């Protein structure tokens, strides 16, 4: 089997990360592997966010909530919480409540309006987020926010 060539590479220096952004990535116990599975990106004030969203009728709750918040705020988004392990897709009202609870908790910890926080989830479809693990680890995640923490966020 041949290897595919790629031009992708990791950012290697703080100077190459987006100006004013902070990053964090930790292992929160969302995955059984003990690997990093929770990340947070904090954007500077007055940042503008845009999104490209699937047109599929099968969408995770976080996709719908992200799209609504970006439209409602004209793109004024400050934080993005990212989890891996559970996609939180096809989970009904439970998935919606988990997304809203997680973004509310992040907004409290960062002193932001809840509408300024987005959430992205990837992982096993049909499985709700391990919400207790996620919520319990948010204070540690926020403490890890640093401009030079891009790699930890990327690993999650």
Model regions: which residues?
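N-terminal amphipathic/basic leader segments beginning at the initiator methionine
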Residues: 1-54, 58
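Short coil/turn connectors at secondary-structure junctions
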Residues: 34-37, 59-60, 74-79, 112-116, ...
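Glycine-rich, mobile lid/loop segments that gate access to catalytic sites or pores
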Residues: 100, 105-156
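Alpha-helical support elements that line or immediately flank enzyme active sites
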Residues: 81-110
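Short acidic, glycine/serine/threonine-rich loops at helix termini
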Residues: 53, 92-95, 128-133
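Glycine-rich oxoanion-binding loops at beta->alpha junctions
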Residues: 53-74
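Short, ordered loop/turn segments at secondary-structure junctions
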Residues: 45, 68, 85-87, 122-124
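Short beta-strand segments
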Residues: 41-42, 81-83, 119-121
